Swiss-Prot record:
The chain crosses the membrane at residues 10-30, 76-96. It is found in: Cell inner membrane. This is Large-conductance mechanosensitive channel. The lineage of its organism: Bacteria, Pseudomonadati, Pseudomonadota, Gammaproteobacteria, Pasteurellales. It is a multi-pass membrane protein.
Amino acid sequence: MNFIKEFREFAMRGNVVDMAVGVIIGSAFGKIVSSLVSDIFMPVLGILTGGIDFKDMKFVLAQAQGDVPAVTLNYGLFIQNVIDFIIIAFAIFMMIKVINKVRKPEEKKPVPKAETLLTEIRDLLKNK
């Protein structure tokens, strides 16, 4: 019973719940960006590059033989995934910049009175 109680306390901490929400939102955001790249950007890029479909760009290492499919290096899909990553990384970078601007800077803690007095005493002793 103690184990369940400890787990519940751990799971309900603010950091864990915030992280879980962030992972879910990040996953959904990733799907949106992937769709944006594959359904909007890549077709336009394909038209600009002469009608090339990046999904079909590949090197054939071994031809298909009977029921065995061809062995390929799908570099077109890799290019598409790199573009996905760049867009996601840029969007996260921009969100962090906005969050850091909005976040209030930490207030400087006042110097404890004892430390101030000791500093003054030290300075007075130096001047003697």
